[in-house]
């Protein structure tokens, strides 16, 4: 009898449950080829696609990079970085839940806002803009498309590429308002409007990772105590010739003697005498105030320990970053998943140097008198990214794949810090001094000029970092300043004026590469031509074919 009752109870209907639907899925092969041309430093979207809840994506990428022909084989490397990200719609559009019917009131369902639009600028988007790279036909005015992909790109930049110490965030609208597109190159306002691509920052090295200050925030200070009495002392005037008081104007000039009378306000400064005589026995009080610290309260060991901890806290924030994902990692050693922090999610990536092939000349040239064996160069590099993406998605998102080409920088105008070290023994490294605060990097280390600016501070770096880093260098005729310079053999920096630690200086510079190419970006010829081939296997919550029929009315 008990067994029968238990079976009966097991079959009781639960009104709080909804069975839902079993959605069949289909495995679909989606190849995609795209050919692009761009310059060094530009972060280019090379692939974008929407994904839906329950969709699984496995993506491989094969790339063929062909830079412009080099004048000679360069002695530096161009490095390709490829990144794949997922950006949920909800983190770039706050009304997503309302769009799909979520209501904050009772049964009534209010009109849901549509996905926000962006309208092409006057004359349409230009060639080479983000809109162009995302697949929108350029130079067509009046185009009206949905804006979430541009917002997603801006979100990725803010989360992963922006230097938070020097650069402002890209503007990012989250509401349902429509926007007007742009062809501009402003790195703050024009990114979410489909303007020019964001320029990546240089790779981190001794100079590019410098901090604006030793700590993030005001330096922690130690107060001597609460209050101290101020004591005054008198000084006897020795004789009648003493002149303890002299009248001067606001520029330090002695005020003229004369008689003040009725006149205009701008008549000048006048007094009867320019000094005041003292009499015997009188006392003057010039610059006579100081604190008597014998009665001041001192700082306790607990307060000292707390102040040191505050300073450590601020130094950790400066060096490790203060995005929340960075804070939890630096302070607690916990790497929080991107999805938990409403961030764009990094799915995978790859980094590889481009190969350069030398081409020796086999016959002389009459016009330029170049001999046989004269070298030129070209690059044709195949890059294979297996499993660039392999993920199941649980919400509406965009997959966006980005590519950028950069190089490691060589410096030719500075002098290493150790050449100036040795004023005293505390200027030299000692294990006891290993963990002192961030130390200044002087201007002379990146560009020496032989003037007072050499000793000014360029930025701050961890103590003794110059002993752990050796900057790449050139010399002799390889220097860009040489009258017969051969700087087309390398990508070394050469500054016309003293660089400043700033967002503008931190951006990757395509011009160093331009001087090594036969066809230059300055002549409106993109430095790189790339053939991208995406091989995607998608398991989608949809049939393999959509066949219409009366049974599905």
UniProtKB/Swiss-Prot annotation:
Gene3D superfamilies linked to this entry: Microviridae F protein
What keywords appear on the UniProt entry? Capsid protein, Host cytoplasm, T=1 icosahedral capsid protein, Virion
| GO molecular function (one) | structural molecule activity
Domain of life of the native organism: Viruses
Single GO cellular component term = T=1 icosahedral viral capsid
Question: InterPro entries this protein is in?
Answer: Capsid/spike_ssDNA_virus (IPR016184), Microviridae_protein_F (IPR003514), Microviridae_protein_F_sf (IPR037002)
Cellular location(s): Virion; Host cytoplasm
Note one Pfam family from the annotation: Phage_F
Indicate the family of this protein: Belongs to the microviridae F protein family.
Functionally, this protein is described as follows: Assembles to form an icosahedral capsid with a T=1 symmetry.
Q: What is this protein called?
A: Capsid protein VP1
Species annotation: Spiroplasma virus 4 (SpV4)
């Amino acid at each position: 009898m008990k067994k029968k009752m238990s079976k009966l109870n097991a079959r009781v209907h639960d009104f709080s449950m909804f069975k839902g639907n079993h959605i069949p899925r289909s495995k679909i092969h989606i190849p995609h080829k795209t050919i692009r041309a761009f310059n060094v430093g530009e972060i280019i979207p090379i692939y974008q696609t929407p994904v839906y809840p329950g969709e699984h994506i496995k993506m491989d990428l094969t790339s063929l990079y062909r830079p412009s022909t080099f004048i000679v084989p360069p002695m530096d490397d161009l490095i390709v970085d490829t990144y794949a990200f997922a950006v949920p719609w909800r983190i770039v559009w706050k009304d997503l839940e309302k769009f799909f019917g979520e209501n904050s009131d009772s049964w009534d369902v209010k009109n849901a806002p549509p996905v926000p639009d962006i309208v092409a600028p006057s004359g349409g988007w230009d060639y080479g803009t983000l809109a162009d790279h995302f697949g929108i036909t350029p130079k067509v005015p009046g185009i009206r498309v949905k804006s979430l992909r541009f917002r997603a790109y801006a979100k990725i930049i803010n989360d992963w590429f922006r230097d938070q110490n020097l650069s402002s965030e890209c503007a990012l609208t989250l509401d349902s308002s429509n926007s007007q597109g742009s062809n501009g190159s402003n790195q703050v306002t024009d990114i979410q409007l489909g303007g020019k691509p964001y320029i990546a920052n240089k790779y981190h090295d001794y100079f590019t990772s410098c901090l604006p200050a030793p700590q993030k925030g005001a330096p922690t200070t130690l107060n001597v105590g609460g209050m101290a009495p101020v004591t005054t002392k008198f000084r006897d005037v020795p004789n009648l010739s003493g002149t303890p008081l002299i009248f001067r104007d606001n520029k330090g000039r002695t005020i003229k003697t004369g008689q003040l009378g009725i006149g205009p306000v701008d008549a000048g400064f006048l007094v009867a005498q320019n000094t005041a005589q003292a009499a015997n026995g009188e006392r003057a009080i010039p610059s006579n105030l100081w604190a008597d610290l014998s009665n001041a309260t001192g700082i306790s060991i607990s307060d000292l320990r707390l102040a040191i901890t505050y300073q450590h806290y601020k130094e950790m924030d400066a060096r490790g970053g203060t995005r929340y994902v960075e804070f939890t990692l630096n302070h607690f050693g916990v790497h929080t998943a991107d999805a938990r922090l409403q961030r764009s999610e990094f799915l995978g990536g790859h980094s590889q140097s481009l190969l350069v092939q030398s081409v020796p000349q086999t016959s002389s040239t009459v016009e330029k008198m170049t001999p046989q064996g004269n070298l030129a160069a070209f690059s044709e590099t195949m890059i294979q990214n297996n499993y660039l993406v392999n993920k199941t998605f649980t919400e509406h998102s965009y997959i966006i794949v980005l590519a950028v080409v950069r190089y490691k920088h060589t410096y030719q105008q500075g002098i290493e810090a150790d050449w100036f070290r040795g004023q005293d023994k505390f200027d030299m490294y000692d294990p006891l001094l290993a963990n002192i605060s961030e130390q200044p990097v002087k201007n002379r280390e990146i560009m020496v000029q032989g003037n007072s600016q050499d000793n000014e501070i360029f930025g701050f770096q961890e103590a003794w970092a110059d002993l752990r880093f050796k900057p790449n260098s050139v010399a002799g005729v390889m220097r860009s300043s040489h009258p017969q310079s051969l700087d087309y053999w390398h990508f070394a920096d050469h500054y016309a004026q003293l660089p400043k630690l700033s967002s503008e200086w931190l951006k990757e510079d395509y011009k160093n590469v331009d001087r090594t190419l036969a066809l230059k970006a300055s002549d409106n010829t993109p430095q790189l031509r790339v053939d991208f081939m995406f091989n995607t296997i998608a398991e989608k919550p949809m049939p393999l074919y959509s066949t219409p029929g009366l049974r599905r009315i």
